[in-house]
Curated annotation (Swiss-Prot):
Record-listed E.C. numbers: 2.7.1.113
Protein name: Deoxyguanosine kinase, mitochondrial
Residues that bind ATP: 32-40, 190-194, 242-244
UniProt lineage: Eukaryota, Metazoa, Chordata, Craniata, Vertebrata
Subunit structure: Homodimer.
Gene for this chain: dguok
Catalytic activity, as annotated: 2'-deoxyguanosine + ATP = dGMP + ADP + H(+)
Record function comment: Phosphorylates deoxyguanosine in the mitochondrial matrix with high efficiency but shows very low activity against other deoxynucleosides.
Gene3D superfamilies: P-loop containing nucleotide triphosphate hydrolases
Species, as recorded: Xenopus laevis (African clawed frog)
Binding site for substrate: 57, 88, 99, 106, 130, 135, 199
Cellular localization per UniProt: Mitochondrion
Record keyword ATP-binding present: yes
Active site: 129
Amino acid sequence: MKSQTTKPLQQSISTNLSSNKEMQVKRLSVEGNIAVGKSTFLRLLSNTFQEWSFATEPLKKWQNIQSTSFQTTTSSKPPMDNLLQLMYDDPKRWSYTFQTFSCMSRFKIQIQPLSEPVLKQQEHVQIFERSVYSDRYIFAKTLYELQHLNEMEWTLYQEWHTFLIQEFSRRVALDGIIYLWATPEKCFERLQRRARKEEKTLQLQYLEKLHDQHESWLTKKTTEVSFENMKNIPVLLLNVEEDFENNSAAGDELNNRVKAFVAGL
């Protein structure tokens, strides 16, 4: 009888300790326009702060949607659909589908449990490339304002998004945001240079719209935010207009500013 009561108690204590450790983790998202340099910035941080953990945007998932109804055979592979391509080619038809899937994939990333090695560190920092919040306040909001999401779709999106945020609570909460800032013109220049096939049809005007959304949300604080913990979240604005990938001094400056920002959270 004694062993039966001890084991659940030990499990409960272990769970609570794990939960307490996880609550001490500082979670931040890196936000910014398309092609502002988020992936390059994350590589810079990961090379410097190797004890931190980094979660990149699940781009490949959006580019490869596998049919679940396909009957596999030894001589063929399941068909794949590039949802990102579909959305850019026909935004009015595919925006709601894409935003639903992209947001779901972001939720999956943000609620993933931390590994034991991470939990054993003295300082626990987790960095996400974008977040469930920018999915709503930047991209879905922009698509609605461009009339690619209709009134019904926008209402439904906000309804289930709010429900999931409240349901997952602390597991998707952020402690800070790193906002990578560059002009839309510079982002468009970088977009053309990287030549991602899905982005061939993107115009400067779209990047200008996304830039304005970031400014309203993170700088001017005029975006109406539904979640109390996000209304006064600390934001570190980093100007990345100039190249920092091939400039070690610029890279060091960014690293130092991020280190100081994280230490102050």
